[in-house]
């Protein structure tokens, strides 16, 4: 009897995997970043901008990680600002700056500085031996609360092994690709505060694994302490600069009217802003490629020296007394203070992120006038968070960008209209709101101005943390620049009370393709029509070297005019100079193998995602839709294949099979370009626009009936 009682009282081993492995249909709250009209976005996994996985946006909550005992050593978030301080901007055709724009720049600069200090202080709240992780922390700087060493599946807990068994994945495949499995788990379990690391093969006993794990935790803790010390030194130095230094006059033209204007300087030159935090700004007359970023010029005795930052096609003529030193992917050139170089904080499995310090992938690096003191990066750094390669950039146009956070004020002034209460500009429409994990989208009507009584989509985005501010401004800038019939039209953006950004876009009354799939069955010719329209948008993006990186059915919309458009550019990246990135971001079911394998990826990731979307449209659901772990692991190891022997695909045409096969190539170099896919025989079977217009009433009726049915079920 005593054994029975003790058995009943025994706590069941917790299984955190059930929190993130469910499909989006079963657990909407797991999405990290909602699209305009639907949930289901993820960003992260051991890397990336917001590297980390299923992180729902719960308001005002914090997560507590115990750092004492039972592997709960370490933990906490580390705030690591960028140090590049030279950015470039394109100005309006006007040569004067309005007084309101100037005052806004000044106000934004002061506010952003105080905001960064606020975030920095609120992100690490340590009481005793416990870290409290605020949900608003920048997850780029994630330091795990628990590190688990895994060499084979036997090293997982009992409940985790049971969960893996339920996925029906061959044991040999799991053990042979344990690194891919750990990548998947790190991507999905980031919010749980857990980091899985692969144990070296020479560590075979528990003692060795424990020692290895302790070494990793110590490295993480030392890294955290070093970064905090560097932060303090950096802030002290900036404080000295505020009280000393010669300020130059700033002449920058700011576009705040929200129209889709691609501003260019009259003479084709770009102004270089140096140390925008301290208002110490130097400019030159040479043509500057903004993507060629230089290191921070934190020198108390700058005395208005001209520092020319050029690309390969520009002449660099420096007559200053400072020595010239070239930054490389393995060296950071420092000034007379111990700076927080981006690569010092962010070195990881690849040197790609160091390209930000060397001016992209041009091979020559950025040439700066700096002191000769250099700090070499470790060739074998400890486990550290990895960011997307453009983590400190705000897009201007392909190949040109602002440096973040130093030039955040200029980007904000150019992209966003400051409005104390933007709600007075709109009235709410019938479809009041659609909530996403990172924002709420409303159907609204403008009450005056150019778009009076025009229904638009209004997306409210939180704008408090540093990461959110960068992502919001980058998404706005990209969408503002893009102009294509198959990309949703950007209208304007407003800042409310320094806490929210309201982004206004065209309203798509037909909803997302994902909504349509859940209520309606498409035949192949309509699938081909939608695919053709999306290929046109991808062809346009490829011509600009921009990868969307979150292509999925809930980011494709249709309207009553049979127009199909791509939305949500939050994970998009300009690859003009970077060429490739290493970053697990996007949505689990649509992620390409190279991303899952944590390898460099480029424009071809969108072709893989398109193949999954096409399969979803004809089948009604994505492959392995019940489990994110299984879907990602199999995609990253054996790929996705479709067979005519299956019941659901026995009626598919040969053209469809071939289209899916070429899109879902494991090797990204073998995937065709959007232009090549537009010539594929499957696209030739597409319905006409007139035929699609005839289909829309049935589609909308099915959607309405489904909404009414859900409403009755919720009562």
Curated annotation (Swiss-Prot):
Residues 42-53 have a biased composition (Gly residues). Residues 207-241 form a coiled coil. Residues 427-683 form the Protein kinase domain. Keywords: ATP-binding, Coiled coil, Kinase, Magnesium, Metal-binding, Nucleotide-binding, Repeat, Serine/threonine-protein kinase, Transferase. Its cofactor is Mg(2+). It catalyses: L-seryl-[protein] + ATP = O-phospho-L-seryl-[protein] + ADP + H(+); L-threonyl-[protein] + ATP = O-phospho-L-threonyl-[protein] + ADP + H(+). SUPFAM superfamilies: Protein kinase-like (PK-like). Its EC number is 2.7.11.1. Signal peptide: none annotated. The active site is at 550 (proton acceptor). GO terms for cellular component: cytoplasm. Residues 54-70, 80-125, 367-378 have a biased composition (Low complexity). GO terms for molecular function: ATP binding; metal ion binding; protein serine kinase activity; protein serine/threonine kinase activity. This is Probable serine/threonine-protein kinase mkcE. It comes from Dictyostelium discoideum. The lineage of its organism: Eukaryota, Amoebozoa, Evosea, Eumycetozoa, Dictyostelia. The gene is mkcE.
């Amino acid at each position: 009897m005593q054994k029975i009682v003790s058995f009943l009282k025994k706590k069941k081993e917790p299984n955190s995997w059930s929190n993130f492995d469910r499909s989006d249909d079963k657990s909407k709250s797991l999405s990290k970043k909602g699209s305009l009209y639907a949930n289901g976005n993820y960003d992260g996994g051991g890397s990336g901008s917001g590297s980390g996985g299923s992180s729902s946006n719960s308001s005002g909550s914090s997560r507590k990680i115990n750092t004492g005992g039972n592997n709960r050593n370490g933990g906490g978030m580390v705030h690591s600002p960028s140090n590049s301080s030279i950015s470039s901007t394109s100005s309006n055709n006007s040569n004067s700056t309005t007084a309101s724009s100037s005052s806004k720049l000044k106000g934004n600069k002061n506010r952003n500085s105080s905001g960064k200090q606020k975030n920095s202080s609120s992100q690490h709240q340590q009481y005793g031996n416990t870290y409290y992780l605020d949900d608003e922390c920048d997850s780029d700087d994630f330091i795990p609360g628990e590190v688990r060493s895994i060499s084979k599946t036997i090293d997982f807990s009992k409940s985790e092994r049971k969960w893996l068994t339920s996925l029906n994945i061959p044991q040999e495949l799991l053990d042979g690709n344990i690194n891919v499995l750990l990548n998947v788990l790190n991507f999905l379990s980031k919010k749980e505060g857990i980091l899985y690391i692969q144990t070296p093969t020479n560590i075979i006993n528990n003692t060795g694994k424990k020692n290895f794990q302790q070494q990793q935790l110590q490295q993480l803790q030392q890294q955290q302490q070093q970064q905090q010390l560097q932060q303090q030194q950096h802030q002290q130095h900036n404080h000295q600069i505020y009280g000393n230094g010669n300020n130059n006059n700033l002449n920058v033209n700011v576009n705040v009217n929200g129209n889709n204007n691609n501003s260019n300087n009259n003479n084709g030159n770009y102004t270089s802003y140096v140390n925008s935090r301290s208002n110490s700004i130097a400019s030159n007359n040479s043509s500057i490629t903004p993507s060629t970023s230089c290191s921070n010029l934190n020198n108390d005795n700058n005395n208005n020296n001209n520092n020319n930052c050029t690309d390969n096609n520009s002449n660099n003529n420096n007559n200053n007394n400072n020595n010239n030193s070239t930054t490389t992917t393995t060296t950071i050139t420092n000034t007379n203070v111990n700076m927080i170089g981006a690569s010092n904080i962010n070195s990881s499995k690849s040197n790609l992120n160091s390209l930000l310090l060397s001016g992209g992938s041009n091979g020559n690096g950025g040439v700066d006038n700096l002191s000769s003191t250099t700090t070499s990066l470790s060739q074998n750094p400890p486990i550290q968070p990895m960011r997307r390669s453009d983590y400190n950039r705000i897009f201007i146009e392909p190949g040109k960008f602002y440096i973040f956070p130093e030039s955040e004020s200029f980007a904000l002034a150019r992209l966003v209209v400051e409005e104390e209460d933007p709600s007075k500009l709109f009235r709410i429409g019938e479809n009041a709101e659609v909530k996403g994990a990172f924002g709420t989208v409303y159907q609204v009507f403008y009450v005056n101005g150019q778009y009076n009584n025009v229904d638009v989509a209004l997306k409210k985005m939180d704008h408090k943390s540093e990461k959110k501010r960068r992502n919001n401004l980058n998404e706005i800038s990209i969408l503002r620049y893009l102009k294509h019939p198959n990309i949703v039209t950007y209208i304007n953006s407003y800042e409310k009370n320094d806490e929210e950004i309201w982004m206004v876009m065209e309203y798509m009354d037909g909803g997302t393709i994902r909504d349509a799939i859940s209520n309606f069955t498409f035949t192949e010719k309509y699938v081909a029509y939608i695919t053709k329209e999306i290929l046109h948008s991808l062809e346009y993006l490829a011509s600009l070297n921009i990868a969307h990186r979150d292509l999925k059915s809930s980011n494709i919309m249709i309207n009553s005019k049979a127009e199909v458009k791509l939305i949500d550019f939050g994970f998009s990246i300009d690859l003009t100079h970077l060429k490739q990135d290493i970053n697990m971001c996007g949505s689990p079911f649509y992620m390409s193998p190279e991303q899952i394998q944590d390898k460099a990826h480029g424009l071809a990731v969108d072709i893989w995602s398109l193949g999954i979307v096409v399969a979803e449209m004809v089948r009604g659901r994505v492959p392995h839709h019940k489990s994110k772990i299984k879907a990602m692991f199999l995609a990253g190891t054996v790929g996705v294949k479709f067979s005519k022997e299956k019941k659901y695909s026995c009626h598919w045409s040969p053209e469809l099979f071939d289209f899916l096969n070429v899109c879902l190539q494991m090797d990204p170099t073998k995937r065709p370009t959007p232009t090549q896919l537009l010539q594929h025989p499957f696209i030739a079977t597409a319905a006409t626009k007139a035929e699609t217009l005839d289909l829309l009433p049935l589609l909308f009726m099915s959607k309405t009936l489904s909404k009414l049915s859900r409403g009755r079920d919720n009562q």
